[in-house]
């Protein structure tokens, strides 16, 4: 352009190249981006910038993927946790409260379990229609104890799922600030949420002979455990219990809720597991065995 400064000439040159790129490559850009190619890769191949490719995609109604979406190589129902309106969603929200984590920076939801309980990760995968792999990580100690240190892990990349979980109280670094999500979980679904939490952070202890005994232990903040007891009492009446501070020397609010009276424990566990459609297989088996133990003692 005669008589103009270099910056102006460069500006008009870019506009002209943009028009030429649109005229020649728009359909190719849309197809290749839809097929999974990045804007930078497409731009390099046609002599354009990734920014121009993004602009063309947006101009034609296309959705520019987030970093989390690019990381995600597997199908996923991102809005599974948007509204907690089914037993399955309430259960897995509780399980995430216990054993899951969210990372807003990496836009990642992570759930890990000891390898024997890896079936829980497969159940969550199925629930949220995910094709992400469950990976097994082993810490080798050079002896027969190696298998005891195997961990199964499921990572789901989704900014929407992270945001939904945070909106329901499943926040980063939640250990010392967990509270019951009354606003998110409707009353009829609250026992399923508690069962999910119990399957993650509760236990049915074994007796001296290695058999499940009718008792239950739940770990959490004192405030959260009080709220669990309040929900339980409104459904089946007061439950006899005791509290034990887990590590008093650490000066924090992590507490153990003990339901040690056998009949009370079975009543609590029956409320959690009766007619349940989603649960940890190992915990369900222990509940059945402990209930049978009490039944045999009452009716030999």
Residue ranges and their predicted role:
Residues 5-300:
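Internal intein/HINT superfamily modules and their associated LAGLIDADG
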